[in-house]
Curated annotation (Swiss-Prot):
Family: Belongs to the CinA family.
Listed InterPro entries: CinA-like_C, CinA_C
Protein name: Protein YdeJ
Function: Does not have nicotinamide-nucleotide (NMN) amidohydrolase activity.
Disulfide pairings: none
Lineage: Bacteria, Pseudomonadati, Pseudomonadota, Gammaproteobacteria, Enterobacterales
Amino acid sequence: MNINRDKIVQLVDTDTIENLTSALSQRLIADQLRLTTAESCTGGKLASALCAAEDTPKFYGAGFVTFTDQAKMKILSVSQQSLERYSAVSEKVAAEMATGAIERADADVSIAITGYGGPEGGEDGTPAGTVWFAWHIKGQNYTAVMHFAGDCETVLALAVRFALAQLLQLLL
């Protein structure tokens, strides 16, 4: 389910990665939920942020970095048909990554991120800074696409912040 535009969180300066991971860890622990992650363009930055939070083992057990199509298929069971038809940077593939991570990690909640951090976009003309997200919560996938501006590191940091902030919103 694509998240309605009015339900998309707007990042503010106080939404630092540290503040977001702290709030998210508290929410997940209170709700007794286990989180897993599936990352492509962010290359483990989301997992790294989560592992820096207090009490990480109480809410986070595994994360997957699947940069290539082959890795997405082998590790997360993303279908070759989806990759060929929609590309790795698509709503369909993000949703399959989120579902695959849940199944592999035996978790309750997942975050998946796939996109083009830069400096180049996709061969299909998708611009750099385009990032698809999926969150799998209680059997339901939620998806969103964002178009971030900036250099690669800025785009990736914004992607991590957005993924965390939106999950917090979805769990409320």
